């Protein structure tokens, strides 16, 4: 249990996909103008990551990795070379289901997210979580924990940035830094803040 808590906490604070690995930056910068929209996207990312990472874990362990198809009589088969396209396919399918669900039941959030909801499909943070899961050889329970924690970490980062950007509307930002310029500086400072957690031994 302690091991799972370690994975969860590390994925939020120490190995934050947005602020430690700078994954998912396109959506992160584009949708972080309002806290409400950021929270909606953050919840969507949490849901997608919590589902896709363990599903891709099952896909990898029972179909793709070397010897995984021994149950089907193909023990020597190694399908890891199709891993990337397989993970993207799983992510695309789950995002499509989420998109249809939001369109039907929460149309206001669906309209607020706009084009950025389908863009979750190619959000490198989502794909990166699955690739980290494979690289670290997590089992199913660990992958659920890691997927949920990574989603929470990314959502926390985008909501924090949105809150800061809302406050900055009333700040006297130099003309050359207005817009994305000051946002990049803020993201860098936030990254330094999260870097302080790396000193925690877990």
Curated annotation (Swiss-Prot):
GO terms for biological process: respiratory electron transport chain; sodium ion transport. InterPro entries: NqrDE/RnfAE, NqrDE/RnfAE_oxidrdctase, NqrE. It is an enzyme of class 7 (translocase). It is found in: Cell inner membrane. The chain crosses the membrane at residues 11-31, 39-59, 79-99, 114-134, 144-164, 180-200. Keywords: Cell inner membrane, Cell membrane, Ion transport, Membrane, NAD, Sodium, Sodium transport, Translocase, Transmembrane, Transmembrane helix, Transport, Ubiquinone. Its EC number is 7.2.1.1. It is a multi-pass membrane protein. GO terms for molecular function: oxidoreductase activity, acting on NAD(P)H, quinone or similar compound as acceptor. One of its GO terms (cellular component) is plasma membrane. It catalyses: a ubiquinone + n Na(+)(in) + NADH + H(+) = a ubiquinol + n Na(+)(out) + NAD(+). Belongs to the NqrDE/RnfAE family. NQR complex catalyzes the reduction of ubiquinone-1 to ubiquinol by two successive reactions, coupled with the transport of Na(+) ions from the cytoplasm to the periplasm. NqrA to NqrE are probably involved in the second step, the conversion of ubisemiquinone to ubiquinol. Composed of six subunits; NqrA, NqrB, NqrC, NqrD, NqrE and NqrF. This is Na(+)-translocating NADH-quinone reductase subunit E. It comes from Maridesulfovibrio salexigens (strain ATCC 14822 / DSM 2638 / NCIMB 8403 / VKM B-1763) (Desulfovibrio salexigens). The lineage of its organism: Bacteria, Pseudomonadati, Thermodesulfobacteriota, Desulfovibrionia, Desulfovibrionales.
């Amino acid at each position: 249990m302690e091991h799972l808590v370690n994975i969860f906490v590390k994925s939020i604070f120490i190995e934050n996909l947005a602020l430690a690995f700078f994954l998912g930056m396109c959506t992160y910068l584009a949708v972080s103008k309002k806290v409400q929209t950021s929270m909606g996207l953050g919840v969507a990312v949490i849901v997608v990551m919590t589902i896709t990472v363990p599903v891709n874990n099952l896909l990898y362990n029972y179909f793709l990795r070397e010897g995984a198809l021994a149950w089907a009589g193909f023990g020597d088969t190694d399908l890891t070379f199709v891993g990337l396209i397989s993970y993207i396919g799983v992510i695309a399918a789950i995002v499509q289901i989420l998109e249809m669900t939001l369109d039907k039941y929460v149309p206001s959030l669906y309209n607020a997210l706009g084009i950025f909801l389908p863009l979750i499909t190619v959000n490198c943070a989502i794909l990166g979580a699955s690739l980290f899961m494979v690289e670290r050889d997590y089992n199913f329970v660990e992958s659920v924990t890691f997927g949920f924690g990574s989603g929470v970490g990314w959502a926390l980062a985008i909501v924090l940035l949105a809150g800061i950007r809302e406050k900055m509307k009333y700040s006297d930002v130099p003309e050359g830094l207005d817009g994305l310029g000051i946002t990049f500086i803020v993201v860098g400072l936030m990254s330094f803040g999260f870097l302080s957690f790396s000193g925690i031994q877990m």
